[in-house]
Amino acid sequence: SNIKVITEPISDEEMVQLYHNHDVLIYPTYGEGFGFIPLQALATGMPVISTYDWAHYKNFLGPLKLKSELIDSPWPFPHEGKVFEPNYQHLLELMRDVSMNYNAYSGFYFAQSTKIHEEYNWLQLTNNAFDHIFKKFR
């Protein structure tokens, strides 16, 4: 089998290596909090097929944005409310397209990765998040 379930914590270096050992991240999710997994993959330059309607990083998904539909959650507990159901027919189309045009997608997403590193500078994000608090005590 070419599927391996990782149940133990892995180091940052192992995580980067995991991304570099694969060609495409396929992430058809109904919803996500921050979305570290696709963001990390995008930051390595990996093409990512992902649901985008809720994603704060949707501007970086480019042509591999996976269509979805806003529906009532099929899991009333503990996830009541609305979710974005991935369009699996569109997922198949995107997977086929990226497999046939991998070099073009790879170049596009590699170019996008520098923009992600600029926008998601953790020190700057932290400073922006807490700046209003720091100003009160200066």
Say what each PLM segment does.
Residues P47-T51, G62-K65:
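Short hydrophobic beta-strand element within catalytic cores of glycosyltransferases
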Residues P86-H90, M100-D131:
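A charged, aromatic-enriched C-terminal amphipathic alpha-helix characteristic of glycosyltransferases
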Residues S1-E13:
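Nucleotide-activated donor-binding/catalytic signature segment of Leloir-type glycosyltransferases, i.e.
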Residues G35-P38, D53:
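Short glycine/serine-rich donor-binding loops of glycosyltransferases
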Residues Q17-H22:
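Short alpha-helical donor nucleotide-sugar binding micro-motif in glycosyltransferases
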Residues Y30:
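Aromatic "clamp/platform" in nucleotide-sugar-dependent glycosyltransferases that forms part
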